[in-house]
Curated annotation (Swiss-Prot):
Top-level taxon of the source organism: Bacteria
Gene it is expressed from: atpF2
InterPro entries: Alt_ATP_synth_F0_bsu (IPR017707), ATP_synth_b/b'su_bac/chlpt (IPR002146), ATP_synthase_B_chain (IPR050059)
Chief location bin: membrane
Full protein name: ATP synthase subunit b 2
A GO term from the CC aspect: proton-transporting ATP synthase complex
The UniProt record lists the keyword Iron: no
HAMAP family: ATP_synth_b_bprime (MF_01398)
Function: F(1)F(0) ATP synthase produces ATP from ADP in the presence of a proton or sodium gradient. F-type ATPases consist of two structural domains, F(1) containing the extramembraneous catalytic core and F(0) containing the membrane proton channel, linked together by a central stalk and a peripheral stalk. During catalysis, ATP synthesis in the catalytic domain of F(1) is coupled via a rotary mechanism of the central stalk subunits to proton translocation. Component of the F(0) channel, it forms part of the peripheral stalk, linking F(1) to F(0).
Quaternary context: F-type ATPases have 2 components, F(1) - the catalytic core - and F(0) - the membrane proton channel. F(1) has five subunits: alpha(3), beta(3), gamma(1), delta(1), epsilon(1). F(0) has three main subunits: a(1), b(2) and c(10-14). The alpha and beta chains form an alternating ring which encloses part of the gamma chain. F(1) is attached to F(0) by a central stalk formed by the gamma and epsilon chains, while a peripheral stalk is formed by the delta and b chains.
Length: 259
C-alpha cells in the first residue's frame, strides 16, 4: 500500500491548526472562569476567617472576664464561670460548624460546576470539531471524512487480539451488532464497513446502523454489553483529564491559603 504523504502532511497540519484553535478559544475561557471562581472562594474563606477571629476575640474577652471574676472568689464566681465557659464552647462550635459548612458547600459546588463544565465542553467541542474536521479535510485532502472514519474503524477491528475477537464474535453471532455514527454513512461506505466487520467477526453476522447526532465524531459498534469504537472521544477524555488536573491544582492553591 502506497503512502500518500501529501494527505498525511495535510492531516498533520490540520491537527496542529485544531490544537491552536483549542488553545486560543478553549483554555483561555477556562482559565478566566477559574480565576473568577478563585476570587469567590477567597471571599468565602475571608468571611470564615473573620468569623473565626471574632470567635477568638470573644474567647479572649471571656478569659479576661474569668480572670476578674476569679479574684472575687465566691459561689457566684463558679456559676458565672460555668455559664461563660459554656457560652464560649457554643460560640466556638457554631463558628467551626459554619466554617465547615462553607467548606463543604464550596467542595460540592466545585464538583457540580466541574461536572457541568465538562458536559458542556464535550457537547460544544464535539460540534465545533465536527465542523472544523469536515471543512479542513475537504480543503486539504481528497479523502472524505466518512471514508477516513470507516478505514480507521476497520483497522481497529483488524488489530483486535484473538481473545477479544473471539469474545466479540461469539456475542455478535448470537445478537447481531449495532453500528452508530454521528451522521448517515453513504451506502458504499456502509458496505465497506459491513465487509470489515464480517471479515473480523464472521460472515453471517446481522448488522444494524443507527445515526446519533449527539455522539462524538467517530464510529461505535455495540454487541450486548460489549462496545468497540474509534473516534475523538478519547481525545475528549484526555482533554478532560488535563483540564481537571489544572482545575484541581487551582482549587488546591486556594485551599492551602485558607485557615
Amino acid at each position: 500500500m502506497l503512502i500518500d504523504w501529501f494527505t498525511v502532511s495535510a492531516q498533520a497540519i490540520n491537527f496542529l491548526i485544531l490544537v491552536a484553535l483549542l488553545k486560543r478559544f478553549l483554555y483561555g475561557p477556562v482559565l478566566r472562569a477559574m480565576d473568577r471562581r478563585e476570587e469567590r472562594l477567597a471571599s468565602c474563606f475571608a468571611e470564615a476567617e473573620n468569623k473565626r477571629l471574632e470567635a477568638q476575640q470573644l474567647e479572649e474577652n471571656y478569659r479576661s472576664l474569668l480572670q476578674e471574676l476569679e479574684e472575687a472568689r465566691g459561689v457566684k464566681l463558679r456559676q458565672v464561670e460555668e455559664e461563660i465557659e459554656d457560652q464560649r464552647h457554643k460560640l466556638l462550635a457554631a463558628a467551626r460548624q459554619e466554617a465547615a459548612e462553607i467548606q463543604s458547600a464550596w467542595a460540592a459546588s466545585i464538583r457540580d460546576e466541574r461536572s457541568s463544565f465538562f458536559t458542556e465542553l464535550k457537547k460544544r467541542v464535539g460540534s465545533e470539531m465536527l465542523n472544523i474536521a469536515r471543512k479542513s479535510l475537504g480543503d486539504l485532502a481528497n479523502i472524505e471524512l466518512e471514508q477516513l472514519m470507516v478505514e480507521r474503524f476497520n483497522e481497529r477491528l483488524a488489530q483486535l487480539d484473538r481473545n477479544e475477537q473471539q469474545q466479540v464474535a461469539l456475542a455478535a453471532s448470537e445478537r447481531g451488532v449495532l453500528v452508530r455514527s454521528p451522521f448517515t454513512l453513504p451506502p458504499e461506505l456502509r458496505d465497506r464497513l459491513t465487509q470489515g466487520v464480517r471479515q473480523a467477526l464472521g460472515e453471517e453476522i446481522d448488522m444494524q446502523y443507527q445515526d446519533r447526532a449527539d455522539m462524538p465524531l467517530g464510529i461505535e459498534l455495540t454487541v450486548g454489553g460489549l462496545k468497540l469504537s474509534w473516534g475523538v472521544d478519547s481525545y475528549f477524555e484526555q482533554l478532560e483529564r488535563d483540564v481537571a488536573t489544572l482545575y484541581d491544582a487551582q482549587a488546591a492553591t486556594v485551599s492551602e491559603g485558607s485557615p
